[in-house]
Amino acid sequence: MSGRGKGGKGLGKGGAKRHRKVLRD
């Protein structure tokens, strides 16, 4: 899970934005 959030570039814009918000929270 952590790797996916940090690797937003590979996932894309939608995935990266969603993961970033979750990590910050």
Curated annotation (Swiss-Prot):
Keyword list (alphabetical) reads: Acetylation, Chromosome, DNA-binding, Nucleosome core, Nucleus
Does the keyword Metal-binding belong to this entry?
no
Task: Write out the annotated subcellular location.
Answer: Nucleus; Chromosome
Q: Which domain of life is it from?
A: Eukaryota
Gene Ontology cellular-component terms listed:
nucleosome; nucleus
At which residues is N-acetylserine found? 2
Q: Where do Basic residues bias regions lie?
A: 15-25
The feature table lists the DNA-binding region at 17-21
Q: List the disulfide bonds.
A: none
Compositional bias, Gly residues, is annotated for 1-14
Sorted alphabetically, which InterPro entries does this protein's record hold? Histone-fold, Histone_H4, Histone_H4_CS
Q: What is its main location?
A: nucleus
Q: Which residues carry this modification: N6-acetyllysine?
A: 6, 9, 13, 17, 21
Q: Which GO terms describe its molecular function?
A: DNA binding; protein heterodimerization activity; structural constituent of chromatin
**Acetylation recorded as keyword:** yes
- Region Disordered, as annotated, extends over 1-25
- Give the family, as the similarity comment puts it: Belongs to the histone H4 family.
Quaternary organization = The nucleosome is a histone octamer containing two molecules each of H2A, H2B, H3 and H4 assembled in one H3-H4 heterotetramer and two H2A-H2B heterodimers. The octamer wraps approximately 147 bp of DNA.
What biological function has been recorded for the protein in this entry? Core component of nucleosome. Nucleosomes wrap and compact DNA into chromatin, limiting DNA accessibility to the cellular machineries which require DNA as a template. Histones thereby play a central role in transcription regulation, DNA repair, DNA replication and chromosomal stability. DNA accessibility is regulated via a complex set of post-translational modifications of histones, also called histone code, and nucleosome remodeling.
What name goes with this protein? Answer: Histone H4
